Amino acid sequence: MSLALGHGTIAGSTAAPLSEEGEVTSGLQALAVEDTGGPSVSASKAEEEGKGSQEEAGREASRAEEALEASSAVSDERAEGESEDWCVPCSDEEVELPANGQSWMPPPSEIQRLYELLATQGTLELQAEILPRRPPTPEAQSEEERSDEEPEAKEEEEEKPHMPTEFDFDDEPVTPKDSLIDRRRTPGSSARSQKREARLDKVLSDMKRHKKLEEQILRTGRDLFSLDSEGPSPASPPLRSSGNSLFPRQRKY
C-alpha cells in the first residue's frame, strides 16, 4: 500500500514537472511563432516599399521620356524653321554641270586657236550682245529740299494781288484801282458806258448813306438833294414831309 502510494506520489511528482515543461514548450512555441511572424511582416513591408519605389521610378522614367520627346519635337520644329529660313542657292557652275558631273572645258583646238590669235593680234574681240541702256532713276527729294520749296510757294501766294469779291466790303466805299478800270472804251465815250457790277460793299455803303439822309430830312425838314440849285430863302417856311411819303420831290444822286 505504501509502495503504491509512493509510486503514486512519484508519478504525481513526475507528472507535475511534465505539465510545467509542456507549458514552457508551448510558451516557447508561441514565442517562436511570434518571432517568425515579426520578420514576415517586416519583409512584406519591405516588399511594399520596394514596389512603391519601383512605381515611382517608373513614373519618373515615363516623365523623363515625355520630356525628351517634347524637347526632340521642339528641336525638330526649330530645325525645320531654320531649314525654311536659310537657303543657300547653288552656283552657276553647279546648275550648268552636265550629267557626268564635270565642269565645262573648251576643246584643246579652240584653246590653241585663241592663243594664236592673242599672239598675232594681241587682243581678242569680245563677242557679247550690248543691251540698250535705260535712263537713270530720278532721286527722291530730301526733306530739306521740300522744306526749302514750301516757303517759296508761300511767298508767291503772298505776292499775288488780292482780287475784290462781292463779299469783301468796308464801311466806306473803296475807289477802284487803275488795274480794274476797263481800258477798252473809246476816247470819246463817257465813263458811264462802262458795265456796272453789283458789289456788296457798294450796296451797304448806299444803304448807310440813305439812312443818314433820311435822318437828316426828318431832323431838319429839308432835302439836301433838292432840285433847285439855289438855297432856300430864310423867309420861306421849311418843307415838311407828309406822313405817307418821306421824299416829296425826286432827288438826284
Curated annotation (Swiss-Prot):
Annotated stretches, region: Sufficient for interaction with ESR1: 160-253
Localization: Nucleus
Pfam family, one: PAXIP1_C
Biased composition (Acidic residues): 141-158
Keywords: DNA damage, DNA recombination, DNA repair, Nucleus, Phosphoprotein, Transcription, Transcription regulation
Chain positions covered by the region annotation Disordered: 1-108, 126-253
GO biological process, one term: regulation of cell cycle G2/M phase transition
Keyword Magnesium included in the entry's annotation: no
Sufficient for interaction with NCOA1: annotated segments: 115-159
InterPro entries per the UniProt record, alphabetical: PA1
Phosphothreonine sites (modified residues): 137
Gene Ontology MF, one: nuclear estrogen receptor binding
GO cellular component: histone methyltransferase complex; MLL3/4 complex; nucleus
Biased composition (Basic and acidic residues): 45-66, 194-222
Residue list for modification Phosphoserine: 142, 147, 236
Main location: nucleus
KW Zinc (keyword) present: no
PANTHER family in alphabetical order: PAXIP1-ASSOCIATED GLUTAMATE-RICH PROTEIN 1 (PTHR28467:SF1)
Subunit structure, as described in the record: Component of the KMT2 family MLL2/MLL3 complex, at least composed of the histone methyltransferases KMT2D and/or KMT2C, the common subunits ASH2L, RBBP5, WDR5 and DPY30, and the complex type-specific subunits PAXIP1/PTIP, PAGR1, NCOA6 and KDM6A; PAXIP1 is required for the association with the MLL2/MLL3 complex. Forms a constitutive complex with PAXIP1/PTIP independently of the MLL2/MLL3 complex. Interacts with NCOA1, ESR1, NR3C1, AR.
General function of this protein: Its association with the histone methyltransferase MLL2/MLL3 complex is suggesting a role in epigenetic transcriptional activation. However, in association with PAXIP1/PTIP is proposed to function at least in part independently of the MLL2/MLL3 complex. Proposed to be recruited by PAXIP1 to sites of DNA damage where the PAGR1:PAXIP1 complex is required for cell survival in response to DNA damage independently of the MLL2/MLL3 complex. However, its function in DNA damage has been questioned.
The protein's name in its UniProt record: PAXIP1-associated glutamate-rich protein 1
Source organism: Rattus norvegicus (Rat)
